[in-house]
Amino acid sequence: MSSVSPIQIPSRLPLLLTHEGVLLPGSTMRTSVDSARNLQLVRSRLLKGTSLQSTILGVIPNTPDPASDAQDLPPLHRIGTAALAVQVVGSNWPKPHYTLLITGLCRFQIVQVLKEKPYPIAEVEQLDRLEEFPSTCKMREELGELSEQFYKYAVQLVEMLDMSVPAVAKLRRLLDSLPREALPDILTSIIRTSNKEKLQILDAVSLEERFKMTIPLLVRQIEGLKLLQKTRKPKQDDDKRVIAIRPIRRITHISGTLEDEDEDEDNDDIVMLEKEIRTSSMPEQAHKVCVKEIKRLKKMPQSMPEYALTRNYLELMVELPWNKSTTDRLDIRAARILLDNDHYAMEKLKKRVLEYLVVRQLKNNLKGPILCFVGPPGVGKTSVGRLVAKTLGREFHRIALGGVCDQSDIRGHRRTYVGSMPGRIINGLKTVGVNNPVFLLDEVDKLGKSLQGDPAAALLEVLDPEQNHNFTDHYLNVAFDLSRVLFIATANTTATIPAALLDRMEIIQVPGYTQEEKIEIAHRHLIPKQLEQHGLTPQQIQIPQVTTLDIITRYTREAGVRSLDRKLGAICRAVAVKVAEGQHKEAKLDRSDVTEREGCREHILEDEKPESISDTTDLALPPEMPILIDFHALKDILGPPMYEMEVSQRLSQPGVAIGLAWTPLGGEIMFVEASRMDGEGQLTLTGQLGDVMKESAHLAISWLRSNAKKYQLTNAFGSFDLLDNTDIHLHFPAGAVTKDGPSAGVTIVTCLASLFSERLVRSDVAMTGEITLRGLVLPVGGIKDKVLAAHRAGLKQVIIPRRNEKDLEGIPGNVRQDLSFVTASCLDEVLNAAFDGGFTVKTRPGLLNSKL
């Protein structure tokens, strides 16, 4: 057996460490390069080298974690493959990454690693040669039988395939043209074998051993094809083509070698995907689209970018819950108990949820209503939505809409775009796996708007019970039924929600909590939760209700309970430190007692008198349990109080009045201050005021000027023209906060009346209401939140418009008992209630008109 042109590899080779795939002599493989050592090798040898020798590498398979950048070189496999780098493809952005196309030349054995950094270089010993033999070359006698047997099985395997496939025809020609010594490595790299089996073939240096190990692999492949042909009934010649391509996906002849892309697993996935599509319960339209796409997918090469897009699309279509749903639990009594146990107060909201459950019990095919909980932060809107899902026994999914400004987030991106994906609605359905979950659309009032569209407009179809049974996501491009989904939205205010979207939702107001409700919530839910989170027990800490009230009034001013929860958490952390220190000191004291007793025995034996032992006076005794949290402890833990009852001090001079304002965070009290000085009759307004509030100020001064004689109001010069040589400055404190709205009109009038009459406004009175130029008081919104704010501030009387009297029914009974309400229809009634002794009309004597 003579060789014509043997290949001699260098005695020193740079080593390329791989962990995916095994390169055999005569085969071609693509491998990714992303580890630091391999990147240095590519840059130094392949990108900068110009000689043929610089393109020859030593490929070491089965390297554990070659991508690791550890300092030490990982254990190396004993035998590798000398390879020729045929192609280098890659880039340095966003991070360096290269792909190598390498062709195996021969086996080698590592003799000694000469260098490890920046990439390993080893002294190697060539084990075999890839040589070209003439076609008339005879095999050695001892290998003749094995060679003939191997050749017979190889020909049988190829003839079972479709010879019309170019790759199969090329393989048949290679069996006759290539030397028999090269066939075991080449066929092993083509047929379906595991990396472990390929590694065993690589380690088989003896040609006889390679023949013996490869023949069973060929037999196994032949039996598998026979079984596949029996189980499949060929309808067309295309079926045979599919069978042929399955075991041999891609065969390329490069310098007498073959390439196997090892894509069998992907092909099996396509078969399973097709089976799932045919057995799925998706609608007819969606099924037709999927069948069409799977046919296109079969014809695509996997290298096409559209292949991955189409496959991802089909996998999503199969995973969507077209007809899968959960059974509702409609036990009204259990639902009522669950709602009462988990949420204190909130009677109106719980009543509406129970009404929905009752109607569902009476009529199963009820279209899901669109509920919108509107209220300040921290009152439990999101947790109620989660509780509704728990009560019904449905899956729950939260979609955060705050800051979303692209309508594609709702409807999805069209598949023509790179990186396209379905919208949040379809993604949520895929996540929960059922078609009747509870979807919580959180912060729907904070949707944005941009050049990419208006997501609020995209929600119109989602939240319309008359349309959402035919919701079409841009990514799916087929209709999906959302009518069984229960949508619950949350918002802090309805002012920023578009009118069309607001019309599709049932608004349920969730007001803030009263002080009594906060105390009850703290002791029912917040304190036990904080104790559990901090590893404390009720025997270690005691927080009386008086302390809780101090936290609410002096350290938090909010409609919800989030700040209260944080303050309780701070208290528990401080107590946890004390408890841990006490346990440490107890253990230290115990050790000191033992040492003291042992030391006493020794000294008594020596002197019959105990000497001084280790001093334990520096060890403070552990705190007594439970630790009581009082006002002094609050001051030590939380610092000085953040809020004080300063209402009476701030109303100690004329020209100050208290109004009531509504914000998305709940109700607040609002001071209005006025002063006058010599000037040219100008009105100055400060405090970040909106246009509506500025107009209210002008209305107030105009009404007072027109009624100055009626109330005997004069400026500093005794003129009834209040702006004659007089400037007025109106200020609304908290200047960093934007303020607007008409409800401050009565407060501005009262403040100016106090200024010009030089009388003090009652310090326990707050007011709200819009005014007109005729002196009428018009109704305003947010009465409940405003009244609760007045109650939190310790006020005793609230002046509201008469037409808002109906809103007092929604105020808790204990708040109504603590406050007195004055309903006013005109400014005369407001002024009479705001000042001690009233604000009566003054008439000058002698101005009696007689008709006699």
Curated annotation (Swiss-Prot):
One CC-aspect GO term: peroxisomal matrix
Cell location: Peroxisome matrix
Catalyzed reaction equations: Hydrolysis of proteins in presence of ATP
Active site: 743, 786
Domain of life: Eukaryota
Swiss-Prot/TrEMBL GO biological process terms: protein import into peroxisome matrix; protein processing; protein quality control for misfolded or incompletely synthesized proteins
Domain Lon proteolytic, residue spans: 651-837
SMART domains linked to this entry: AAA, LON
Keywords assigned by UniProt, alphabetized: Acetylation, ATP-binding, Hydrolase, Nucleotide-binding, Peroxisome, Protease, Serine protease
Ranges spanned by the short sequence motif Microbody targeting signal, renumbered to the chain: 850-852
GO molecular function: ATP binding; ATP hydrolysis activity; ATP-dependent peptidase activity; serine-type endopeptidase activity
Keyword Disulfide bond appears in the UniProt entry: no
NCBIfam families registered for this protein in UniProt: lon
The protein, known as: Lon protease homolog 2, peroxisomal
